[in-house]
Structures are given as C-alpha cells and as structure tokens.
Amino acid sequence: MAIVKCKPTSAGRRHVVKVVNAELHKGKPYAPLLDSKSKTGGRNNLGRITTRHIGGGHKQHYRLVDFKRNKLDIPAVVERLEYDPNRSANIALVLYKDGERRYILAPKGLSVGDTIQAGVSAPIKAGNALPMRNIPVGTTVHNVELKPGKGGQIARSAGAYVQIIAREGNYVTLRLRSGEMRKVLAECTATIGEVGNSEHMLRVLGKAGANRWRGVRPTVRGTAMNPVDHPHGGGEGRNFGKHPVTPWGVQTKGKKTRHNKRTDKYIVRRRGK
C-alpha cells in the first residue's frame, strides 16, 4: 500500500493524496454476490428530504458481504482482495472447500492465498471468526456482533478494531476506539485482528468534485440562509448572537443525542472527550 501525492498540474490536483493498493483486484467483482443499489437522493417514499447533502454520484453495485460468518468449521482460501465503493474498508473474496464463495471484510495483514476459518475450533489468527468466549482476553477483534447470530455491527470501517479487556460470566467487556467500554454477550461472534486499509484516513480528495462523485452535495451554512430556512438566517451582514442550533432548532454543541435507556446498563464507561 502506497500514499501518492499528486503533482500540482492543476488546481484540482494540487492537494490530492491517494492511497494506492497494488494487491487489489483490477477486474470486475464477483457477479453472484452483487445486488442493485438505487439512488434515493436523500428522499423518502413521499419524496421529502430526510437526509440532507445526498444526491448524484457514480452508479454502484452493492456487495453482499458476509458479516455473520456462519459457515462453520470449513476452511476457505482468499482468492483476491477487492475495492468496495460502499465502505471505507476493502473486501476479500474467499473460496470455501465446498465450492461456495463469499465476501468478507479484509483484515489487516490478509493476503491472497491465506486460509481462514470460522467456528469454535478456529485458531487465533487474523481473519478467523469465533465466539468471544473462545477468544483470549487482550485480543484485538473487529466485526463484533451485539446479538448472537445477527451479524457484526461494531468495528467494520477501515482501520477499526475493538479490544477484549475482560470476561465475566456470560459477558465480555470491550474497549472501543472511542474510549467507551461496554458489555456484550460472550456468545457473540467476532473476527480476529483489525480491519485493513487503515491508510484510508490519510487520503485527501483535493476538490469539491471528488465529493460529488461520491454522491455528497454541498453543505450551506445556516448564517448564509434566510430566516425562513434556518434559525441562524437573516440579518444585515454576519449577525448571529445566539446558541448554534440545527435547522430544526436543536442545540448542536454538547447536547446528548442518545435515547436508548434499555441498553444503558451494558455501557460500563461512556466514551471519552
């Protein structure tokens, strides 16, 4: 993997920093594991905008990634590593001994030809998935389930990982990258190692158009709007003089947004500042 800084041959190239991975497959993805993906433009079934700043962008196919890792005790060989436009991490196409192919998240250090396995008896090495009751304390894991059999939900983006710091009864305690410590059922499955492509955070798009290719539209400041459009709008010149809020009047600085009291008991320590 290489970090490439583009030459300033134009204003749009001047600040571009690319992450180039020569190991990635250059051909087409594996067709049976593709699904169609339609653009919504951030609108719901009524045609109303429910998520701002979404629209346009390159057409994409969704890759059916195996987050459950429920093909147990059958070894698989990594056929190739691929780019996935739907996530920051790369994915790996693996071929199981029974002939089935699946996509999985590509962990750090996984290469073409490596063997992976899921199940209670799987060895502790990158890419193998097993219940957390069978994983030693102190191990770094990713693609962690919150409910047994539901599929991984925690630590799935590029460079992400979670550390198992304790095991007590039916629960294990995890330390997340945010600093939060939470309990999860020990029966939940996790994959050993951290997600690959950690250099993703070093890339620089360099121009607004690169964001438009990704389907991201501009964000207009509230103070640049009219009073009818935003609480910050209007006034002669740059008037503000109030606490910053969202377009719907909700405070933006420091207001707590979590409303899931049912699972509060599983959080041992809140994330750090």
Curated annotation (Swiss-Prot):
Annotated region described as Disordered, given as residue ranges: 31-50, 221-273
Pfam families (UniProt xref): Ribosomal_L2, Ribosomal_L2_C
Cellular component, GO annotation: large ribosomal subunit
Keywords: Ribonucleoprotein, Ribosomal protein, RNA-binding, rRNA-binding
MF terms (GO), sorted A to Z: rRNA binding; structural constituent of ribosome; transferase activity
SUPFAM superfamilies registered for this protein in UniProt: Nucleic acid-binding proteins, Translation proteins SH3-like domain
SMART domains membership: Ribosomal_L2, Ribosomal_L2_C
Single biological process term from Gene Ontology: cytoplasmic translation
Biased composition (Basic residues): 253-273
Quaternary assembly: Part of the 50S ribosomal subunit. Forms a bridge to the 30S subunit in the 70S ribosome.
Record family assignment: Belongs to the universal ribosomal protein uL2 family.
Protein's job: One of the primary rRNA binding proteins. Required for association of the 30S and 50S subunits to form the 70S ribosome, for tRNA binding and peptide bond formation. It has been suggested to have peptidyltransferase activity; this is somewhat controversial. Makes several contacts with the 16S rRNA in the 70S ribosome.
Name of the protein described by the UniProt record: Large ribosomal subunit protein uL2
Taxonomy of the source species: Bacteria, Pseudomonadati, Pseudomonadota, Gammaproteobacteria, Pasteurellales
Gene encoding the protein: rplB
